[in-house]
């Protein structure tokens, strides 16, 4: 008997999942390749050096019900940020063999480019190619440095698209720090902010998760101290002018359409939740730091 073609089997199972869920096949494929990349990180010797953050972390919380995203973002700690060294690390990670998932990664043609996270932190974006049966899929991963995570990172079980595939357990950001970083971006960019996903994600986390206010403030303080946040007496973020701006309202509607969000969700409602929960925290922070 010849060697089993796991890739072909997975393709069929993903087609069945598409029919069951209504999600587009290419989206499920991208999610599957991300999952199998994360599996290789999780079984590598570098498991504790890469903390999952961003859209893939939010997906880990809510599975296919989360905001559709195919981003993979890590914060690296206790590891060199030298790009040549990181390339060798990723070659090793991508070279891990897992016959059962049908995926292989091209370890010989990894490219990279420098990135800057929130104007301050140098990071690296890696580009590489994944293969499964006849499918060739281009991928990228962002690696950032220098942020603080409060409370300390915990391990999570990443949701699997298909049963009977090797499971994924890896280190991840705290949700409090996810909110803190997104809130920092809102305050920093203020009226020039077009990142609707940050407003959406903060709203979802603040309304769907039970987060302790004291712990959330600790995360906000740690992030603001680390990223530096200057007092802004002319802040527009919490004003009616900001919320009702016609361009921003249109950006919000286009964003919801882009992510195929079916429920009614106005930007005014989102901003009311963010204002009620987070405005007192930045006021407390500024009061204690002026």
Question: Which role fits each region the language model picked out?
Answer:
Residues 52-56:
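Glycine-rich beta-strand-to-loop/alpha-helix junction loops that act as flexible
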């Amino acid at each position: 008997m010849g060697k089993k073609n796991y890739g072909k089997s997975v393709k069929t199972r993903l087609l069945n999942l598409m029919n069951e869920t209504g999600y587009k096949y290419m989206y499920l494929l991208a999610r599957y390749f991300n999952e199998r990349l994360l599996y290789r990180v999780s079984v590598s010797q570098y498991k504790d050096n890469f903390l999952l953050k961003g859209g893939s972390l939010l997906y880990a919380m809510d599975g296919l019900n989360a905001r559709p995203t195919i981003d993979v973002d890590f914060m690296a700690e206790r590891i060199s940020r030298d790009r040549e060294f990181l390339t060798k690390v990723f070659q090793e990670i991508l070279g891990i063999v897992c016959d059962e998932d049908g995926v292989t990664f091209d370890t010989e043609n990894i490219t990279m480019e420098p990135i800057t996270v929130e104007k301050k932190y140098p990071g690296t974006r890696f580009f590489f190619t994944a293969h499964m049966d006849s499918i060739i899929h281009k991928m990228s991963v962002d690696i950032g440095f220098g942020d603080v995570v409060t409370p300390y990172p915990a391990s999570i079980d990443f949701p699997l698209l298909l049963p009977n595939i090797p499971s994924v357990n890896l280190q991840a950001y705290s949700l409090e720090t996810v909110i803190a970083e997104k809130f920092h971006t809102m305050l920093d960019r203020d009226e020039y902010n077009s990142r609707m996903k940050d407003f959406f994600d903060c709203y979802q986390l603040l309304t769907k998760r039970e987060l302790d206010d004291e712990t959330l403030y600790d995360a906000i303080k740690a992030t603001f101290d680390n990223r530096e946040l200057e007092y802004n007496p002319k802040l527009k973020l919490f004003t009616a002018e900001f919320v009702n701006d016609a361009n921003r309202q249109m950006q919000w509607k286009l964003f919801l359409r882009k992510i195929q969000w079916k429920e009614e969700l106005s930007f005014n409602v989102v901003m009311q939740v963010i204002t009620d929960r987070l405005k007192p925290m930045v006021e407390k922070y500024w009061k204690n730091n002026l």
